[in-house]
Amino acid sequence: MAIEVRFHSRGAALAGTLKLPDGAGSSGPVPAVAQGPGWLGLRDARLYEPYHEGLLAAGIAVLVFDYRGFGDSEGDATYLDPMDQVADWRSALTYLESRPEIDSDRLGVFGSGGTGGGNAVMVAGLDERAKAVVSQVPIADGRDWLHRMRRESEWLELLAALREDRLRRVTTGEAAMVSPREGIMVPTPERRTTTVKSDVDGRIPALVQLASAEAIFAYRPVDVVDRISPRALMLIAVENDATTPEDHAYALYRRAGGPKRLVVQTGTTHYAAYAQYRDVVNPLIVEWFRRHLVSGEVHVHEAGAEADIRYLSRPPTQGGD
């Protein structure tokens, strides 16, 4: 059952969809996972549906919502600050606590795609209500993320444009506006051709403040990931990822305590991995949440080898495709 809901976060009314598993509420409250979209994502993206189906089948509710300024949520659509999104996500956890169908002691967070994955880490690092975390293709350091998308000359041009914009905003009140896909990010060739996000691309703000880049510069999930332990963290990366370099996931993994796991998808690319590894990765995500969203007085902690790193690979099909 899916219920369209609204809740408030720092003065903005946010739109969400609460998906409940069969029998939720009739046999007691159920665990729930809150999901905020990835970079330039929306709550109703087709991309997320297989994840939700797996969690619902496991008896776990899902609350997916639009960040402020996106989709059906209120708020300024021109200024993208990941920390505003983190605040929205924490408000989503509070909303889940208000629902009688939900066990407020068994809340998890799931995020995918750049700031989506990074936000999941940031939320859990700041909010102990998140008892289990799955972060897919996350960023660890926003400044490094934007820097590595650019040739050095392009990076220096961005820094110069930001300096000029700061002066203009302070002296005139006017802000430079850019495309979030071209002026904040630099799209890879794969991003220009993929259809993975085609159902939401046309509903994303066309222009945002260039100053959004400065907010991303200040965004460092790696600074809080160590606070998650002893709650459970699973990170998912793509080897040789041209959009979100996998060493960001490695940096988060190294800094985190335990329980923790790093899953690395090989022989694929950032966007292709979603479909190529779906039937492998989705069960791992469901199993992680089932294992670690434990209620009552029983809590499961693990100590073991330093590396719980799993490399996933697909054997070539017949004919070599």
Question: Residues of each region from the PLM?
Answer:
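N-terminal cap/lid segment of alpha/beta-hydrolase-fold proteins
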Residues: 1-28
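The serine-hydrolase catalytic nucleophile loop
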Residues: 38-53, 67
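Catalytic nucleophile-loop/oxyanion-hole region of alpha/beta-hydrolase
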Residues: 43-45, 70-108, 275, 279-281
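Conserved alpha/beta-hydrolase
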Residues: 56-72
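Primarily recognizes the serine-hydrolase "nucleophile elbow" in alpha/beta-hydrolase
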Residues: 91-169, 207-208
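Alpha/beta-hydrolase
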Residues: 164-224
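Short beta-strand/loop motif that positions the catalytic acidic residue
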Residues: 228, 234-237
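Conserved alpha/beta-hydrolase "acid-adjacent" motif
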Residues: 242-248
